Amino acid sequence: MTLQRTPLHDLAIAAGAKFVPFSGWEMAVQYKGLKVEHQAVRTEVGMFDISHMGKFQLAGENLIAAMQKLVPSNLARLAPGQAQYTVLLNDHGGIIDDVIYYHQGDRQGFLIVNAATTQKDWDWLTHHLTAQGITLTDVSQENILLAIQGPQAEKALQPVVENLDLATLKLFNHGQGQIFGETAFIARTGYTGEDGFEVMVAPTAGKKLWSALIDAGVMPCGLGARDTLRLEAGLHLYGQDMDDDTTPLEAGLGWLIHWQEKDAFIAKDILQTQKAAGVQRRLVGLEMQGRGIARHDYSVLVNGEAVGLVTSGTMSPTLEKAIALAYLPLEFSKVGQAVTVEIRGKQYPAQVVKKPFYRASKK
């Protein structure tokens, strides 16, 4: 299969990128190195080419009412210019994908979805929304999407943005500005646990933006650092930490369900039943107590008996400890629970800890 490339591919090569296949795309996994990229985002600023992600424009008279049926979060409380992280639910209460919905007014909205699930999401949304008179436009290939992340993100980005004061954008707010003569969609969102922005703009201006930020000393970062940053921040990766068979309650995303604010939505009854009965498993944080790094699909044991599976794991550059996410039965999910992780036939001690593993200091 031929891998797709983003419009910034040649610029990534020039910046020294090493590439790997990811969800049908040839993506930069690192530039100068995972640790230095990770550190740049935690202490200063780094940028990620995330143009591979799915981007859908939604329009229609009853847009909010139609979307309300597909997600457990109350989108009706959003004002234009605000955004909501939420999940698309299937008929069984499982998570089709985690997405960000950007409210642009009563008749307009925008969705950014995961690259691996772009077609699945499109099929689900068109099936449910077109009958409600909603028009969907897939603009995934039309624009670049660049994430500028870190404590110095605002300072780095503002010089190339006109007609928008980034300081006025609160977390999970978005607006329009001008970047190199093109209208740009700019949101104060991210996937690193740090302050930052995600910028969508036409490729010509996007290439100029990349080059301008490189010239300003912003470090290009790859998927490797993106993964360690999000894991330290306790953020989920769809397809590993949750999937079609995982409910928001199991995944620790119950806070996305606005029970009292919403009428019917897909699988509400199923989720209410699960909430009343209690979940049987829960996504927890693990910290290794010595050597060994827990990786995806490694077994978690209690008293020598396998009770769960690791979904994501890495060596944390910030904490200098091995950390992981894992699903464990409720009785073994409390903070302080001692477990072991089987790594290449040997058991290594670990402990259930509070999530997130890292929290950025507030501005």
UniProtKB/Swiss-Prot annotation:
InterPro entries recorded: GCS_T, GCS_T_bac, GCST_C, GCV_T_N, GcvT/YgfZ/DmdA, GcvT/YgfZ_C, TrmE/GcvT_dom1
Catalytic reaction equation(s): N(6)-[(R)-S(8)-aminomethyldihydrolipoyl]-L-lysyl-[protein] + (6S)-5,6,7,8-tetrahydrofolate = N(6)-[(R)-dihydrolipoyl]-L-lysyl-[protein] + (6R)-5,10-methylene-5,6,7,8-tetrahydrofolate + NH4(+)
Molecular function, one GO term: aminomethyltransferase activity
Domain of life: Bacteria
GO cellular component, one term: glycine cleavage complex
Keywords: Aminotransferase, Transferase
Keyword Zinc-finger part of the UniProt annotation: no
Isomerase as UniProt keyword: no
Pfam families: GCV_T, GCV_T_C
EC number: 2.1.2.10
A biological-process GO annotation: glycine decarboxylation via glycine cleavage system
UniProt cross-references to HAMAP family, sorted A to Z: GcvT
Described purpose of this protein according to its UniProt entry: The glycine cleavage system catalyzes the degradation of glycine.
Quaternary structure and interacting proteins, as annotated: The glycine cleavage system is composed of four proteins: P, T, L and H.
Protein family (similarity comment): Belongs to the GcvT family.
Classification via PANTHER family: AMINOMETHYLTRANSFERASE, AMINOMETHYLTRANSFERASE, MITOCHONDRIAL
Protein name per Swiss-Prot or TrEMBL: Aminomethyltransferase
Gene name linked to the record: gcvT
